Amino acid sequence: MENQIKANNKKEFDEWFKPFSEKLQLRSNLTNSASLCDRVPDLALAEMKMALATDDKEKDSIFSNALVEATRFCAPIYECAWTCSTGVVQKSLSWFDKNKDFIKLWDAKYMDLKKGIPEPEQLVSYQQAAQKWRKDVGYEINQFTRSLTHPVVAEYKVPGEIAVDVKEMLSDMIRRRNVLLNGDGENAGKKGPISREHVSWGRELAGGKFQVVFNPPWGDINKCGKSGIPLAATAMVKVAELDGSKKLEDIRQALLDLKKWVEDNKDALEDGKGNELVQTMTKHLAQAVELSKKSNALRAQGAQIDTPFSAYYWAWSAGVKPETFFTLSQFLFEMGQSARGGKKMIKALTSTPLRWGKGLINLFADDDFLGNRLYMHPAVLTPGRMSEMGACFGVIPVASPEDAILGSGHSKNILNFKIDTSVQNPCASTIVQLYRIQKSGFDLESLEVVSTEHLLHQSFVGKRCPTQNAYKVRGNATNVNII
């Protein structure tokens, strides 16, 4: 047995894929990239079962099975086959061998990242590595395997019957974001939009114009916004969010220049006021750095996971070789046939005689992870993130590709559903069905991760296929207008 998707480049792959796709009779009326899907999944039975369920184990099983059912036939077959082709497999696994120094900042700290949220530099380094992998391997062969650079969508159209649900999900995303940035106290959720004028002030400061601190557009340099956070700090955070975290270092340098100017021009300032201003701005910058770390933690959520890159990193770390890749593909394909909870997943991985089974278990995040799991580093594996691997390697069992006709459900592939209202936005419609099931069985406010909101957020970001990278998408997806 071996990988049957034999292709070293796009030309060879297209030659392999043409007869394969004809045999599978792929369709694209409901999905962005051609799939096996011929109808929008009907999950009404799962919703009824959830309403009658009495214990968490049963509820988990119902929801997990609904996820598999919802995504069983919607995967982008072309992109999944390309991701698993012999050339991409060989190049990707050898890429990590050759680029150990390039991934060192987070790979060498993997044990720490299994326990807590990452530093901003570790997130940036991950994305730089993902971009390098994509370029070196020649991964991006069409619009559904590329890195996105567009602004987030301003409007998101949904059918009237699900509009209330989508708006409810969006409101909860905003609430969770504000709790993360502002804490869980009485000011949580009060964070308002940051004005363009304030952002311009922050950009000028980052550009070296320290004189702007003498007369900020909001008046008193210590003035706070609704959240209780100084406006100077929130302006700095926004600049870092829009233009990159290096801007905070630029602001630090501007404040050092300010300090020197104050020392050299004491006669031009009221007694003690110059040093007081420097100290105040230094405090505001320190607060901005901490807020930026939290904001970066938010940006680390799954919308920023480069799914194929992480999948190959986990495979490489677990000891998968090109010769054994087909066994991992088969395991993940079977995983998408019927839902498995975390315990069953670990049992199955423990039971396999293949070394990569134990290797994957050793990569799993700690049970006592410090912080919200939604914000863990995108290179850290969890039982839930096994579905990320499945979305890439488990749709087509590479040793017997024709078996793909049986379908294999992995949640991230829901993004391949179209968002066109001409076909009733099957992406949002399917996510809402899952949300209703989840809402019926669980107290969503108490959950660290609401997986359905997470999927909808990625649709807002503009991901139309799990094989795309969305890190460079500009703007805040939660500012979208639902119509």
From Swiss-Prot:
Annotated positions for site Cleavage by host CASP3/caspase 3 = E270, D271
Cofactor(s) needed? Mn(2+)
Q: What is its main location?
A: virion
**Keywords for this protein:** Capsid protein, Helical capsid protein, Ribonucleoprotein, RNA-binding, Viral nucleoprotein, Virion
Q: Where is this site: Homooligomerization?
A: F214, L277, P353
Looking up InterPro entries in the UniProt record yields: Nairo_nucleocap (IPR003486)
Lineage top rank: taxon = Viruses
Family statement drawn from the similarity comment of this UniProt entry: Belongs to the nairovirus nucleocapsid protein family.
Stated role? Binds dsRNA and ssRNA and probably participates in the packaging of viral genome. In the dsRNA binding mode, the nucleocapsid protein specifically binds to the vRNA panhandle secondary structure formed at the termini of viral genome. Does not discriminate between viral and nonviral RNAs through ssRNA binding mode. Displays dsDNA endonuclease activity that is sequence non-specific.
Subunit annotation: Probable homooligomer; forms a double superhelical polymer. Monomer.
Comment text on domains: The DEVD motif is a CASP3/caspase 3 cleavage site essential for viral replication in host cell. However, the importance for viral replication is apprently not linked to caspase cleavage. This motif is involved in homooligomerization.
Q: What is this protein called?
A: Nucleoprotein
Name of the gene this protein is made from: N
